[in-house]
Amino acid sequence: MGKPIVAIVGRPNVGKSTLFNKLAGKRISIVQDTPGVTRDRIYAEAEWLNYKFTMIDTGGIEPESEDIIVSQMRRQAQIAIEMANVIIFLVDGKEGLAPADKEVAQMLRKSKKPVVLVVNKIDKLKDENNAYEFYNLGIGDPVTISSSQALGLGDMLDRVVEHFKDDESDGEDDERINIAFIGKPNVGKSSLINKLLGEERLIVSDIPGTTRDSIDSYVNTDFGEFTLIDTAGLRRKSKVKEEIERYSVIRTYASIERADVCILMIDATEGISEQDQKIIGYAHDINKAILVIVNKWDLVEKDDKTMDKFKKELKVNLSFMPYAKYLFISAKTGQRVVKVLQTAKECYDNYTKRVKTGVLNDVISQAIMMKEPPIVGTKRLKIYYVTQIGTKPPTFIFFVNDPACIHFSYQRYLENQLRENFDFQGTGIKLEFRERKEK
């Protein structure tokens, strides 16, 4: 499920972050950067040869002493092995083959994940010969690049996307809805999942997830089959070492990538945090269905207006996703727990909803009659027709006289009309505008 993940792995100072930043600098059609992580940009959405994928920078903190190098590289390589579809193994062509390179290569050889060996810092043609010693790693033919000068990146990416063709899913889980539970530690993610499993009593099996800190539980209900993904909680950087936090973030983001529906769990006694906003912002940006659950509602002193007030404050903090659904529960007492999977299924149904073209155009025609498009410059937007081209999320293409004439306020108006008529609560929708010459 989700886009392929490509992890950049290597010992310190081989140029992992330089390569990542070069790729994230829109030199290869980067779709978008992730929100939130300020100093260390961990994820970037990319596209090459019509393949969309997610790049991960697994670069860590520079070790303080030699004895830390091997353990740090082992941790990086292990994480990459667990969650990546393809691994870029980056080595330093100037410094040459190092013992730490051999340590990483040994781990990668044992895995069945495809690895592209990339020799960096080959800035001149005469340096090409420096790549030959890396054949000793037993990883295959190396690709030579200079990340600082953006040389050889196309050849490297060609090799990467070749592996996507061999990594197609067998489709056996296509009918199962993947739900990722995300949020801070101790917010009640595991308690809620255990409650759901205990009440449904239809667990197929428990298997290790794609990351060390997540467990996938399969649940079959009378309204759908679900995979429940329990993720590691995200802590404040002041409470843990930064390098450990980095891996926690990577694992959580990987779980979001796999999910159809992301459930952000918030502690009712603490409210929403900046970290919550960042992580759900990533789910929003890569177009996942979203449900916000406020847990521990039993611990809040309340009257008949408390829930509305709490929800209003949440919507202000999450104003970038006004479509999100909200649910107030207590995993401990079981209050409204029965509604969790039902509400997640509603989000998923809207996430995969298709609207017939005829009905769609009737609604848009009516919307235009009620509110004519504004004049932009000297031209007024003309909408000839609209059609839905995809789901996850629902995506609509408007064929118009000139896409430059669409004003953001009118685009928002059209989106609101679609939402009012077709109920897309719980999911974002995408509107695209293409030129069609008037006959």
Curated annotation (Swiss-Prot):
CDD domains: EngA1 (cd01894), EngA2 (cd01895). PROSITE patterns: G_ENGA. Coiled coil: none annotated. Keywords: GTP-binding, Nucleotide-binding, Repeat, Ribosome biogenesis. Residues 353-437 form the KH-like domain. GO terms for molecular function: ATP hydrolysis activity; GTP binding; ribosome binding. SUPFAM superfamilies: P-loop containing nucleoside triphosphate hydrolases. InterPro entries: AAA+_ATPase, G_ENGA, GTP-bd, GTPase_Der, KH_dom-like, KH_dom-like_a/b, P-loop_NTPase, Small_GTP-bd. PANTHER family: GTPASE DER. GTPase that plays an essential role in the late steps of ribosome biogenesis. Belongs to the TRAFAC class TrmE-Era-EngA-EngB-Septin-like GTPase superfamily. EngA (Der) GTPase family. Associates with the 50S ribosomal subunit. This is GTPase Der. It comes from Clostridium botulinum (strain 657 / Type Ba4).
